[in-house]
Structures are given as structure tokens and as C-alpha cells.
Regions:
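Gly/Pro-enriched, hydrophobic low-complexity segments
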Residues: 159-266
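Residues on the lipid-exposed face of transmembrane beta-strands in outer-membrane beta-barrel proteins
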Residues: 359-365, 394-398, 475-479, 491, ...
């Protein structure tokens, strides 16, 4: 080895010299390209943004929508019912908005004026409007979507070509390194001395919409970080439907009208604030619309119209409200609102291993009495086609002190069917000797009695014999002393009634149990409202309290955090434990607050990252203690996004690791991988019981139009 040592050292030195020589031979063109891109990446940091957060301006938007092809499926698309059912093929709308910035520096629009030829002035293709307010220098262009090529941390996803132009300018061409919906192509005119972008074009596809955007940036100060004018052509395609939208927005307009206006339809006021004239095509659409409306008005004045039940009731009223989201404000100053998800839209479904296909719907409403007093109501429901059960959860929340997050919440619902814990252990094959005192009646007292064997493979029909319906009520008052400490006090009640009461009567056991328990909780937020949350729950049930026939005592601790990293990456962690400290004479139910089966599974952004997907439901009710941990890593591009053909459809990917320790499981673990696309979310999971493989499963949900 020693005789080769000198040769090895010399070889390494010569290789390093070669690399150094190559670095010194970088062409002037490459050096210019690197210099320009370095300035572009740093430009936003060099701008003085003092006063930007308080800055208020105004913007004008106009757009045309042209229906090239349409069929009946267009009615399933949120906000498109009016276009799908309306008689016209071309529509125009104009907005006049007040523009401010939120806490994250992203634009927020308040609509002052709105005139439109779309029936009922419906918000159509509203999801596309966010493309008109891009944050060019941010990590993401449109809210949390599309990685901006002009942010330093995203450079690994793009290739750059820079061409020198006269007058101190440079043209930048941007190409994605892979085909994916989260990256785009771009062309920009840049100041080669400062890195300021003066003009930029984007081309990409997201959420079934192909878009072409041209932007003229602001000239000076913090205005140069935002668009001064934005134009876009958007092509939407869905199941044979083809819609084209042409959009133009002008920013930085002066104040002309009162800010008290709210979505007013006034053509005279719009003409007053309109910074660019309508072209002939746009003027013709308005002309035909008002001529037709005048004809209808004249006809109504001369004749009593005949009611067309199929059109006026079935299509216009029921069809719109059943197939699309309903969103409406009310009150003199729009203090109240309600939102209802589509009732009969087949796209609002999901699937899990235990519940099969679940059809879901959601209703929200609220009313603001004053700046500090607000009442909110939500009805969240779902029907499991495998279990033939309807689940619901109804929280009514009264917010009385926003500063201290003070609210009073009343929550009612029906939980998962729950088994007596002795039965649950028997079904899992982990029964205790004392369980037999309950499970075997005196057959001599019941000649000819035949009962199913309660075992690990008990079928669904016989399982109903042992199950209880669970209706619950929870009353909670929450108060935060400051940004770091919060407190809850309340009352929890469960009424559990046997599905088949005669079964438990055979064992001389109650068929109905009622528990009433005062509950307190302490919340700790060491890093403030946006950091980790640590929570300790204490619940004590008293026998004979308000009709209760169960006494128990339970303590749970839970910690959750989510860390948002760069490039749309996030790390989610949840740790928790719970145990019963007291068990009464009829301690027959184990039911935890932070460890239970989610009976209304949500979508990608709901509870996927904190649940056990393959754990049999009996394990939630079989142990008097638990220790759990869940970890999730999410990124737009992990593995599948880099694959040809299918990778371009991937919007985000996730890795899951979950672990659980309870009686007889030391431990139970799940490993999972999930992807979300414009259409569906799909997850695959593998379970290991006491380190031994215990099966695989999947879960999916429809994600179409989740942002519409």
C-alpha cells in the first residue's frame, strides 16, 4: 500500500487542479448568467418594504369566459352551474377591489363593485382569479401552489438561460428540470445591474387549468415586488368540457369610491373607475345581454309568464343548490354567512379500509354580532356504505373574546359503535379470566339458547349483538391567558345504548350506560400561537351525576407540531399518552378523547397525518392505557413526481410512520406512502403487530375542486 501512496496523492492533486482550471475557464456568458440570477434571487431582500403592510390600493379586473364545448358533467364543477345551464356561450364580468396585504404579505381583495352577464352574478372559475395576484419573488407563486423560479430555494427544480440585452437589460429563460404541475416555464426581462424584474411571462398547468400569464411589474420601491398589470389566458378542461377565460387586472389605482361599498352592481360607477376601455367584443357581449334583459322585462310587463316547473324549480333552484356549493352572506353589512357543500355531487366521497366508501357533506354558518361576538355552527356528516351507518358531528361555537381566544362550544354527535371492553378483548383474542364471568350465562336457565362464539373472526351481523350506539354531548369553555397558556373547563356526557338490548339482558347486564364527567384541560404553547401545542386533559365521571351510572377517571397528554420548511416541505409530529386512573364497578367502556377512530374521514389536509389507518377498531376500546406517536413528511416531489408520464400529475407526496403501545401490542406500527393529484388522493399502508407483518391496506379520496 505504501508504494502506491505517492501515486494516489499525486492523482488527487492533479484532479483538483483540473477542476480548478475548469472553474477558471468559465465562459463570460456563464459568468454573466450566474451574476444576473444571483441578483434576481436577492432583489426582494434589497427593497425597503417599510409601510407596505399598511399600504392600501385599488385594482380593476375584467374577464371574458367563452364556452367552447360543454356537456352535462359541467354542472358537477363548482361555480360552473350557471355557465353549464345558461343559454349563452360568452360572458363578461368586471370587478373593482380594494387591495391590502395579510400578515404573510399576500394580497387580500375586498370587492367593492361587481357587474356581470353571468346569471345571478355567480362567481365562475373563481379559483383562477388567484393566478392574477402572483408573488413573483416568493417561494410559491399562487398562495401555497406553484414553486416560483425566482426564489433562491427553488433553483434546484429549474434550469436558467440568460441573454444579454442592450441598455443594461437581460432576458431570462426558465425551464423546469422535470414535468410536474408544481413547476412552470417562464421568460423575464431583468435589470442586469439590480436584478429587478420589469416584465415576466409564466406558462403552466394546475388543477385542470392551463394558464398563460403576462405581467408588468411595478416600477419603484416595494411596488416593484408586485404586478402593476397582469393579463392571462386560462384554458379549463374537464370530461370533454372546454372553457376559455381571458383576464386582465390593473393594480395601483387611486381611491375614487367609498370603501363602504360591498359587491355593488352599478354600471355607472364601474364606468367611472374603469382604467381601460372595453374592446368591441366585450362591448357587444354587454349590448346583447342588456337587450335580452330588456326584452324579458317588456314581455313580463305585457304578459303573465307561465311557470316551467322543470326549468324554474328542478333546474334553476334544486339543480344549482344540490350539485354545487351554496355560499351566501346575509345581514345589512354581510354579518352572517352560510356555506353548504354539494349534496348530490358524486365527487365528495372517500374510501378507507374499515368504513369502505364514505359519502360526506359539510354545512357551515356564522353570524357576527359585534367585533368581539360571533356565533358559528357546523354540521359535518358522512354515510358509510360498508357499515350502513350515518355519522354526524355538530359543533355550535360562541366566540366572545378574540383577543384571549375565548369561546363557548357545544358539540353533539354520534360516535363510532363501541363494544363493551370485555367483548372487545375477546374479539381481539386477549381476554382476561374475569371476562368469562360476563361472557357465559347460565344456559340452564334458557333451554335451547344458542349464542354466537365471540372471537377474533366474529362476522358483522353477530358483532351487532355486542355493540353499543354512542351519542355524546360536550360543553367546553376555552380561554387563553396569553399567547403561551390556555385553559379549558367543561362537561362531557355519553349515552351508550345496546344495538340489541336483549343480548345484554341475558347476562343480567345493563343495556344502557350514561356517563357524565366534568373535564379540564391545560394548553401550553412554548413558542406562541404558531408553534407546538402541548395539552393535558383530565376527565372524571361521577356516578349518579345527572343520571350517570358509570364512574371513572382518565388522564391524557397530547403534543402536536407542524414545521413548515422551504419548497413546500412540512414535518408533522404528534405524540400522546393516556390512561385510566380509576375504574368503577361497571368499568365496561374504554373511550379516549385523543385516541379514537375518526368516523368521518377527511381529505388530504384533514387528519391523515395523525391517525392509524389499519388498526382494528376494537383496539381503541380494549386497553386501559396507550402511548402513540405519528410522524409525517410532505414535499411536492419525493419519488413519484420524478417518474416519466405519471410524475407531472403529482401535486404532493407524503411519508407516514405511526407507532402505538397498548396492552398486548408492544408495539403496533404503520408505514405509509401517499400522493395527491388533481383528481384523487391515494395512500398505501403496511401494518406490523409486535414487529410481525400484519397486512396492507389503502385509502383514497376524491380531491377534485378542493380549492374551488
Amino acid at each position: 500500500m505504501k508504494k502506491y501512496q505517492t501515486h494516489i496523492i499525486l492523482t488527487i492533486i492533479f484532479c483538483m487542479m483540473a477542476f480548478a482550471a475548469h472553474a477558471r475557464r468559465m465562459s463570460p456568458r456563464d459568468a454573466f448568467s450566474d451574476s444576473v440570477m444571483c441578483l434576481v434571487f436577492k432583489y426582494s431582500q434589497s427593497v425597503d418594504t417599510t409601510g407596505r403592510a399598511e399600504h392600501k390600493s385599488y385594482a380593476y379586473t375584467k374577464f371574458q369566459i367563452k364556452t367552447n364545448k360543454r356537456n352535462a358533467t359541467l354542472m358537477l364543477v363548482p361555480t360552473m352551474y350557471a355557465v353549464a345551464h345558461g343559454g349563452g356561450r360568452r360572458f363578461i364580468s368586471e370587478f373593482y377591489n380594494q387591495m391590502t396585504l395579510d400578515a404573510n404579505g399576500r394580497p387580500v381583495a375586498k370587492r367593492l363593485l361587481n357587474i356581470s352577464t353571468i346569471p345571478h352574478r355567480s362567481n365562475t372559475l373563481s379559483s383562477v382569479l388567484k393566478y392574477m395576484t402572483p408573488t413573483v419573488y416568493g417561494e410559491t407563486l399562487f398562495e401555497t401552489n406553484i414553486l416560483s423560479p425566482f426564489h433562491y430555494k427553488n433553483r434546484r427544480y429549474y434550469k436558467y438561460a440568460v441573454t444579454q440585452l442592450p441598455f443594461g437589460k437581460a432576458q431570462v429563460y426558465v425551464y423546469p428540470r422535470l414535468k410536474n404541475t408544481q413547476v412552470i416555464e417562464a421568460r423575464a426581462i431583468v435589470d442586469s445591474q439590480s436584478g429587478k424584474i420589469s416584465m415576466v411571462d409564466f406558462e403552466g398547468e394546475y388543477d385542470m387549468t392551463r394558464f398563460y400569464i403576462s405581467i408588468i411589474m411595478g416600477k419603484d420601491g416595494f411596488g416593484s415586488l408586485s404586478p402593476a398589470r397582469c393579463s392571462m389566458r386560462a384554458n379549463f378542461s374537464f370530461m370533454g368540457n372546454k372553457i376559455t377565460g381571458m383576464y386582465t387586472t390593473v393594480y395601483g389605482l387611486p381611491k375614487i369610491l367609498s370603501d363602504s361599498l360591498n359587491n355593488v352592481a352599478d354600471t355607472a360607477l364601474m364606468a367611472k373607475v374603469r382604467p381601460i376601455e372595453l374592446n368591441q367584443d366585450e362591448a357587444d357581449i354587454y349590448k346583447k345581454f342588456y337587450e335580452k334583459r330588456k326584452q324579458i322585462t317588456d314581455s313580463l310587463n305585457n304578459n303573465t309568464p307561465e311557470k316551467n316547473f322543470a326549468k324554474d324549480i328542478l333546474w334553476d333552484v334544486i339543480g344549482d343548490n344540490v350539485l354545487n356549493r351554496i355560499s351566501q352572506g346575509f345581514g345589512k353589512q354581510n354579518q352572517g354567512y352560510f356555506r353548504i357543500s354539494p349534496i348530490l355531487n358524486p365527487l365528495y366521497m372517500g374510501y378507507s379500509e374499515r368504513k369502505g366508501i364514505v359519502y360526506k357533506f359539510d354545512l357551515k354558518g356564522g353570524y357576527r354580532f359585534t367585533e368581539n361576538l360571533e356565533l358559528g355552527l357546523r354540521f359535518k356528516g358522512g354515510y358509510s356504505m360498508k357499515q350502513h351507518r350515518f355519522y354526524f358531528n355538530i359543533p355550535l361555537t360562541f366566540n366572545y373574546n378574540p383577543k384571549h381566544n375565548g369561546y363557548l362550544k357545544l358539540e353533539i354527535g354520534n360516535g363510532n359503535r363501541i363494544s363493551n371492553n370485555r367483548v372487545a378483548r375477546k374479539m381481539l383474542g386477549i381476554s382476561k379470566p374475569e371476562d368469562n364471568d360476563f361472557l357465559y350465562p347460565l344456559f340452564s336457565e334458557y333451554p335451547g339458547l344458542s349464542l354466537p362464539e365471540i372471537s377474533t373472526d366474529i362476522d358483522a351481523n353477530n358483532r351487532k349483538l355486542t355493540e353499543f350506539k354512542d351519542d355524546y354531548l360536550r360543553l367546553t369553555n376555552h380561554w387563553s391567558f396569553n399567547d403561551y397558556v390556555g385553559f379549558e373547563i367543561g362537561l362531557v356526557s355519553h349515552q351508550r345504548k345496546a344495538v340489541i338490548e336483549s343480548f345484554y339482558k341475558l347476562f343480567n347486564y345493563p343495556s344502557k350506560y350514561v356517563s357524565v364527567a366534568p373535564a379540564v384541560a391545560l394548553e401550553l404553547l412554548p413558542w406562541g400561537k404558531k408553534g407546538s401545542i402541548f395539552k393535558i386533559d383530565y376527565e372524571k365521571g361521577w356516578k349518579n351525576l345527572l343520571g350517570s351510572n358509570i364512574d371513572y377517571e382518565r388522564v391524557e397528554a397530547d403534543a402536536q407540531t407542524i414545521f413548515q420548511a422551504s419548497r413546500r416541505q412540512s414535518y408533522s409530529v404528534r405524540l400522546g399518552a393516556g390512561f385510566y386512573t380509576r375504574k368503577g364497578d361497571h368499568w365496561d367502556f374504554v373511550d379516549y378523547t385523543n385516541f379514537h377512530d375518526d368516523n368521518i374521514p377527511g381529505g388530504w389536509n384533514d387528519s391523515w397525518s395523525g391517525e392509524f389507518e389499519l388498526l382494528p377498531s376494537q383496539w381503541y376500546n380494549a386497553s386501559d392505557y396507550y402511548i402513540r406517536g405519528n410522524f409525517t413528511y410532505e414535499a411536492p416531489m419525493i419519488a413519484t413526481a420524478w417518474l416519466p408520464l405519471i410524475g407531472k400529475y403529482i401535486e404532493a407526496e407524503r411519508l407516514y410512520v405511526s407507532s402505538l403501545v397498548v396492552n398486548h401490542l408492544h408495539p403496533y406500527t404503520e408505514w405509509g406512502y401517499g400522493v395527491t393529484t388533481r383528481a384523487i388522493t391515494l395512500g398505501f399502508f403496511a401494518a406490523f403487530k409486535n414487529t410481525k407483518f400484519n397486512g396492507i391496506g389503502c385509502r383514497f379520496g376524491f380531491e377534485l375542486f378542493r380549492d374551488w
